[in-house]
A protein has these predicted regions:
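Glycine-rich flexible loops
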Residues: 1-321
Length: 321
């Protein structure tokens, strides 16, 4: 399959399913062809916070190239699937794989590989640790410490927000408020509204969190209405005739000076949103301190959010939830 000049997403997944030895097995990853093109027995792939945070910061590509040198191939972002597999195949046509330890896909993640599973895993840990250590050396946590007052929890306003969010979604939803150090610090940030609307750690997250968060003022329902309008505009700008707009409910948002709010239609989906946001908020703050948070533009985010393969993945987890 990797030798083909072109292959549609639907055709690709059909061919991958035809190759299954067990027809009841889970559908292979959209990156299965890419994994197969890497000439090693074992491949590890993560959306490591440290590497993607560097990638999403000002001058991130240059920083990663300096950090990893010739050990790691740095490639520009390309939408996952067949096109990405072709990009990697072309970029590595003359590569000596014995000298390469990993591949960074900017704004996406890190691949490591080896003939031995432990060697591939250890390479992942070592490269991620190197990125984490680099960030620790560049960002002075003590310089930003301050006393942030915790405002009283307005239970009535929060209950009204959850109720109105359910009306937007079309059925009752769950909501939670995080007032941890990172979330409260973010909520007190002077540019919190701009940052929460800027974009995610990696575009894969958009199917769970949407491409941007909401901004909730003291009376949060007004922020919910603003998000619905903004998301409608986002869809109108990027949609094609075959697209149908998803629900307008935000999956998270910053409640100014109070914390981070998360929404979902079920407990399982809420836990997913909470987990993603718990990684996203510190990454954005770190990216800002590294020179500025620079995620992918909304055109790329829309392509993933409304990609038929990602929507199929979301539908499969929704039925399980």
């Amino acid at each position: 399959l990797g030798k083909l000049n072109e292959l549609s997403d639907t055709q690709m997944m059909r061919e991958l399913r035809l190759a299954l030895l067990d027809p009841t097995a889970p559908t292979p990853s959209v990156e299965a062809i890419l994994h197969a093109l890497i000439p090693h027995r074992y491949v590890d792939h993560t959306h490591t916070d440290a590497v993607v945070t560097l990638s999403n910061s000002e001058g991130g590509a240059a920083r990663l190239a300096e950090l990893f040198g010739n050990e790691v191939l740095i490639l520009p972002y390309t939408m996952p699937g067949f096109v990405l597999a072709k990009q990697v195949a072309e970029a590595t046509a003359d590569t000596d794989w014995t000298k390469l330890r990993g591949i960074v896909l900017l704004n996406h993640g890190l691949f490591t590989f080896a003939e031995d599973a432990k060697d591939s895993y250890n390479a992942m840990i070592e490269l991620v640790t190197r990125a984490e250590d680099f960030i620790a050396g560049q960002v002075d946590d003590s310089a930003t410490e301050s006393v942030i007052p915790l405002r009283p929890f307005d239970r009535l306003a929060f209950a009204e927000l959850r109720y109105e969010a359910g009306k937007v979604f079309g059925s009752p939803v769950l909501a939670s408020l995080d007032t941890g150090v990172d979330s409260l610090g973010f909520a007190a940030h002077k540019a919190a509204g701009q940052l929460v609307a800027s974009g995610p750690l990696t575009p894969d997250h958009t199917i769970h969190t949407k491409p941007f968060g909401a901004v909730f003022p003291q009376s949060p329902v007004a922020g919910l209405r603003s998000f619905c309008s903004d998301y409608s505009d986002y869809f109108g700008v990027h949609a094609h005739p075959e697209h149908r707009c998803l629900d307008l409910m935000p999956r998270f948002g910053v409640w100014i000076e109070r914390g981070i709010v998360r929404f979902a239609p079920s407990l399982k989906r809420l836990k997913i949103v909470e987990d993603i946001v718990a990684h996203t908020i510190p990454a954005i703050l770190t990216g800002e301190r590294l020179g500025g948070w620079r995620p992918l533009p909304r055109t790329d985010l829309f392509d993933v959010e409304y990609w038929e393969l990602e929507q199929a993945k979301l539908k499969s987890t929704s039925t399980a939830a």
